[in-house]
Amino acid sequence: CASVIKADDYDEALHLANDTDFGLSAGICTTSLKYATDFRKNSKAGMVMVNLPTAGVDYHVPFGGRKGSSYGPREQGGYAREFYTIVKTSYISA
């Protein structure tokens, strides 16, 4: 299940993405590198997609969410030693 919500401007889009109890993945469609970079940094999700679907992951990168999603340590790779860090996986399609 996926949802698409149209926002009036970038600030509203970021607010909508973060205004949830869950944080497995978030995405934004934009032609602005400025907004893509800001969304990647300020989205409160474990995985961030820009101009890509939010479903599906590469299995060789750390996988996990924030907030009420995917509670606990991230899966895959050497993430076990980085247990106390915050990692965000980002994708941008030009």
Identify what each model region corresponds to.
Residues 1-94:
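Conserved C-terminal structural/oligomerization subdomain of aldehyde/semialdehyde dehydrogenase
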